[in-house]
C-alpha cells in the first residue's frame, strides 16, 4: 500500500517550505552573482573621506556594494573578508569627468553616404544619425550607455590606476547626444550605468554635412532649435489638455529632449577652452538659461574671476597643450601659443583660488600615467593636492549631480574606493586595491583579505576576487 500525506499534512509541509524560503530570502547575501564576497572590511588604514577630516587607524566596511560604516571603532561583520590596511590610505574612487572609454570609434562611411549639400564633404559615420535635412549633426536622443562596450581594454587600465567611474561622451556633433556616467565594474553594461542621461554635449564646430558651415551658422542653428523647442514646449501640453479643435503638433524627438534641457533638468557641456570660447559659452548659456558646465577650461587662468562671477562650473581637460612630436620646422609657434602651453597647467590653481568648482577630464589622454603626470604639473603650478583630489571625487560628483551616491567615503554611498600606499598623485605611489560597486579588484599581490573567521589569508579558489596587474606599478 502506498502512503501519502493527508491534505492537512501536505499543507503543513508547504507552509514549512514557504517559511524557509522567506527566511532565506531575507538572509544576508554573502556572495555576489559571480561568487565574489559581498562583505569586506579594510582595517587599520588611513581614510581620506574628502567630505570630512582624515581618519587615522580607521576601518571602512563594505556590504552589498555599499559603504556600511566608516570610523575608528567600527564593528566588523563576522562574514566580512578583512584587508589589513596598515600603511595604506583609502580614497574615494576617482571620477573621469569626460572621456570616450568604451565608445565606438567613428568609421568612414561609403562614398555614397557623403555629406549633404556640399561637394566633397567629409564622410558621415554610418552609425551616426544626421537627423532630418534641417537638423544636421543633431541627435540629443543618442545615449552613450546604449553604445558602451565594456570590453574596451582601456577600462581595465583606468581602473587599475584608481578610476572607478567615467563620464563617457558620444562623438562630437552640434548636439552630439547624452553622456552617461559609468562605473568601471563588470562585464554587463546594464550593471555599470550610474546615470544614463548625465550630460548633454554641445559642439560649436561647423558640420561636414554642408549646413551650417560656419561658427555663426552653428550658433544661429542652435538658436533656431531652442526657439522651436520653446514653441513645442508650449504647444504639446496645450494640445494634450484640449485636443479638440486644435491642430496636433508634430512629434519631434529633438525638441522632446531639448525641452528637458531648457527646463534645466540636465547639465549641458559647452566647449570653452580658451579666451574666445569661454566668454562665448557663458553668453550662450545665459541667453538660454541652461544648467551648464564649461568644458575645456585650459585658459581658465586668464578668466577665472569672470567664471566665478557668473557662477559657472568647469570640467578641465588635463590634456595640456604641447608641441607636436614631429613639428614642421617652418611652422614656428607664436608667442601666444608658447605662453598658452606654459600657463595652461596653472588654470586649475587659478580656478580654485577664484572659488570655481571644477572637475577633471582625461580628454583624450591615452594612458593613465599621463593623467597623473599632468595632475602633477597642475600641482607644481600651485594647485593643492586636496583640491586635485576633490576635482576627481566630490566636486566631480556634485557637478554631475551624483554626490548623493559617489565622490566621498560615507555610509550609504556606493563602495567605490581606491587603496594606495601613499599620496594618490605621488610619482612612486602604488595602487594596491580598487573597489567598484563593492567588487574587489586586487592590483598587487599583498594583504589578501582573509576568510571570515580565519586569521590567515587563504581563500578558496572560487572566492578569489578578480585579480589585476600583479606588480602594482599602475598609472604613474
Where are these regions (language model features)?
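N-terminal secretory signal peptides that target proteins for export/translocation
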Residues: 1-11
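His/Asp/Glu-enriched, well-ordered alpha-helical/loop segment
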Residues: 106, 120-125, 129-130, 141, ...
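Polyanionic/metal-chelating signatures
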Residues: 148-299, 430, 436
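Histidine-rich, glycine-flanked metal-binding segment
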Residues: 34, 38, 47, 51-93, ...
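Bacterial N-terminal signal peptides
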Residues: 11-26
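Disordered, low-complexity segments in secreted/periplasmic proteins that are enriched in proline
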Residues: 33-34, 111-126, 450-476
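C-terminal cap of metal-dependent C-N hydrolases
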Residues: 45, 398, 410-453
Amino acid at each position: 500500500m502506498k502512503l501519502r500525506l493527508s491534505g492537512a499534512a501536505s499543507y503543513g509541509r508547504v507552509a514549512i517550505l514557504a517559511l524557509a524560503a522567506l527566511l532565506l530570502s531575507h538572509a544576508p547575501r554573502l556572495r555576489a552573482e559571480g561568487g565574489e564576497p559581498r562583505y569586506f572590511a579594510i582595517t587599520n588604514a588611513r581614510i581620506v573621506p574628502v567630505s570630512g577630516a582624515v581618519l587615522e587607524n580607521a576601518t571602512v566596511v563594505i556590504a552589498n556594494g555599499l559603504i556600511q560604516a566608516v570610523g575608528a571603532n567600527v564593528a566588523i561583520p563576522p562574514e566580512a573578508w578583512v584587508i589589513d590596511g596598515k600603511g595604506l590610505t583609502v580614497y574615494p574612487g576617482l571620477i573621469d569627468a569626460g572621456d570616450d572609454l568604451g565608445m565606438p570609434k567613428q568609421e568612414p562611411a561609403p562614398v555614397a553616404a557623403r555629406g549633404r549639400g556640399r561637394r566633397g564633404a567629409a564622410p558621415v559615420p554610418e552609425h551616426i544619425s544626421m537627423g532630418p535635412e534641417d537638423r544636421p549633426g543633431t541627435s540629443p536622443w543618442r545615449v552613450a550607455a546604449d553604445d558602451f562596450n565594456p570590453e574596451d581594454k582601456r577600462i581595465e587600465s583606468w581602473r587599475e590606476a584608481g578610476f572607478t567611474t567615467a563620464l563617457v561622451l558620444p562623438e562630437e556633433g552640434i548636439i552630439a547626444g547624452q553622456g552617461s556616467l559609468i562605473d568601471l565594474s563588470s562585464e554587463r553594461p546594464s550593471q555599470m550605468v550610474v546615470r544614463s542621461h548625465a550630460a548633454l554635449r554641445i559642439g560649436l564646430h561647423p558640420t561636414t554635412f554642408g549646413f551650417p558651415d560656419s561658427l555663426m551658422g552653428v550658433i544661429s542653428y542652435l538658436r533656431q532649435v531652442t526657439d522651436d523647442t520653446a514653441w513645442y514646449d508650449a504647444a504639446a501640453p496645450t494640445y494634450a489638455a484640449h485636443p479638440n479643435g486644435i491642430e496636433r503638433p508634430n512629434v519631434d524627438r529633438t525638441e522632446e529632449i531639448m525641452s528637458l534641457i531648457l527646463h534645466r533638468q540636465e547639465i549641458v557641456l559647452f566647449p570653452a577652452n580658451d579666451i574666445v570660447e569661454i566668454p562665448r559659452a557663458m553668453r550662450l548659456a545665459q541667453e538660454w538659461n541652461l544648467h551648464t558646465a564649461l568644458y575645456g577650461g585650459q585658459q581658465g587662468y586668464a578668466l577665472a574671476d569672470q567664471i566665478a562671477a557668473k557662477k559657472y562650473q568647469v570640467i578641465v581637460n588635463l590634456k595640456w597643450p604641447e608641441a607636436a612630436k614631429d613639428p614642421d620646422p617652418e611652422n614656428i609657434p607664436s608667442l601666444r601659443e608658447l605662453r598658452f602651453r606654459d600657463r595652461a597647467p596653472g588654470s586649475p590653481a587659478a580656478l580654485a583660488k577664484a572659488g570655481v568648482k571644477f572637475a577633471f577630464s582625461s580628454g583624450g589622454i591615452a594612458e593613465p600615467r599621463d593623467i597623473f603626470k599632468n595632475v602633477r604639473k597642475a600641482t607644481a603650478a600651485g594647485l593643492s593636492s586636496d583640491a586635485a583630489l576633490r576635482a576627481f571625487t566630490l566636486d566631480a560628483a556634485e557637478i554631475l549631480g551624483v554626490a548623493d551616491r559617489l565622490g566621498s567615503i560615507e555610509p550609504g554611498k556606493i563602495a567605490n574606493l581606491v587603496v594606495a600606499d601613499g599620496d594618490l598623485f605621488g610619482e612612486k605611489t602604488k595602487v594596491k586595491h580598487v573597489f567598484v560597486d563593492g567588487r574587489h579588484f586586487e592590483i598587487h599581490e599583498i594583504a589578501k583579505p582573509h576568510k571570515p573567521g580565519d586569521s590567515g589569508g587563504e581563500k578558496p579558489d572560487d572566492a578569489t576576487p578578480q585579480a589585476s596587474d600583479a606588480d602594482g606599478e599602475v598609472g604613474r
